[in-house]
């Protein structure tokens, strides 16, 4: 079945037809869970940092107040169509690589996306869309992004070494946890005809790619994963890749031990800064252009005139966001 036919029958699977499917990716992997120390009547507990994920480390770098809202206060946020697309696409791509190489076709990926959405819609996003037409438009747009993926690489040409790899790694006094999308070995041939094998970490993104001048910042999480691989396997990955399906755009960065040593030091500094904020209760809000994408700008953030203890009602419009 081609893309056009697949789009036309977007709803051919009823949710009840795929109840046996289970979502293998831990749903709250990036929500660090600090322990509350000194909990007793009349005492405000002090959080203790126990684990840190790349996402939450990035949150603290961006804005300490954002980290507090997500990891300490655990303020719930409304799911968005962008999050749903990213979650569903990741699951579909994971299942694509579970198939024999000749079966990794666009048509199979479209079907896997429909299957994944039918199950995730019931379990995680039951009220995301207000109409059938809105859901159909979202589905067809999602299939267009998946079609773009096949213009970036041929999934039948290699076998991933790892898929959705759950990593929990102790580094000195820190525990770093996250999920690595994919890792594979590829053979690269240079202009002189010489070949070498590379260990590559790949991450999918369904949001728009940042401009090239900001691309290096987007590699923050992947450099953490490269560090975790070095610690657990004793080998330094050669390259990290970001595949932005909405474009499509591919960014790559070659990795070396010097970069990973610097990332180790950066994690040490972030861990210490988070522990200090937990002890002092000081979580400064750092305003920037990214505030326009923040779930808490219009409801909780003191930098925008709100009292976190008495949040304003959340706007009814869909929160702006980037697909994962």
Question: Model-predicted segments: where are they?
Answer:
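Short, compositionally biased low-complexity segments
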Residues: 59-67, 88, 105-126, 235-245
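Short acidic (Asp/Glu) and glycine-rich catalytic loops that position anionic groups and cofactors
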Residues: 66-73, 90-93, 122-123, 200-206, ...
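Mg2+/Mn2+-dependent nuclease catalytic core
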Residues: 165-267
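Nuclease catalytic cores
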Residues: 57-58, 62-101, 139-143, 160-164
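A non-catalytic, helix-rich entry segment at domain boundaries
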Residues: 11, 24, 92-163
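Metal-dependent nuclease catalytic regions and adjoining charged, substrate-binding loops involved
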Residues: 27, 31, 51, 194, ...
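C-terminal, charged and often intrinsically disordered regions of DNA end-processing helicases
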Residues: 3-83, 319-324
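Hydrophobic (often cysteine-bearing) scaffold residues that line and stabilize catalytic clefts
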Residues: 81, 85, 138, 218-221, ...
């Amino acid at each position: 079945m081609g893309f056009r036919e697949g789009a036309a029958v977007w709803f051919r699977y009823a949710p009840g037809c795929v109840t046996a499917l289970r979502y293998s990716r831990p749903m709250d992997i990036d929500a660090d869970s600090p322990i509350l120390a000194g909990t007793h009547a009349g005492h405000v507990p002090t959080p203790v940092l126990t684990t840190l994920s790349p996402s939450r480390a990035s949150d603290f770098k961006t804005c300490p107040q954002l980290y507090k809202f997500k990891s300490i206060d655990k303020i719930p946020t409304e799911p968005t169509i962008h999050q749903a697309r990213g979650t569903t696409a990741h699951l579909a791509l994971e299942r694509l690589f579970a198939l024999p190489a000749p079966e990794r076709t666009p048509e199979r990926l479209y079907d896997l996306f429909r299957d994944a959405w039918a199950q995730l819609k019931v379990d995680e996003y039951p009220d995301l869309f207000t109409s059938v037409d809105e859901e159909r438009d979202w589905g067809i747009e999602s299939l267009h992004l998946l079609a773009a993926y096949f213009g970036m690489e041929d999934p039948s040409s290699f076998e991933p070494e790892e898929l959705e790899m759950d990593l929990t790694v102790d580094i000195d006094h820190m525990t770093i946890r996250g999920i690595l999308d994919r890792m594979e070995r590829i053979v690269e041939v240079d202009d002189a005809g010489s070949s070498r094998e590379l260990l590559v970490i790949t991450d999918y993104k369904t949001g728009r790619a940042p401009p090239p001048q900001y691309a290096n910042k987007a590699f923050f999480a992947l450099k953490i994963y490269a560090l975790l691989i070095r610690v657990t396997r004793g080998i330094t990955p050669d390259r990290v890749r970001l595949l932005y399906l909405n474009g499509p755009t591919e960014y790559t960065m070659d990795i070396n031990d010097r970069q990973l040593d610097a990332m180790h030091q950066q994690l040490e500094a972030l861990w210490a800064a988070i522990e200090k904020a937990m002890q002092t209760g000081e979580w400064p809000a750092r305003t920037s252009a990214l505030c326009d994408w923040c779930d808490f700008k219009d409801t909780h953030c003191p930098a925008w005139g709100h009292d976190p203890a008495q949040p304003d009602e959340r706007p009814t419009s869909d929160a702006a966001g980037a697909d994962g």
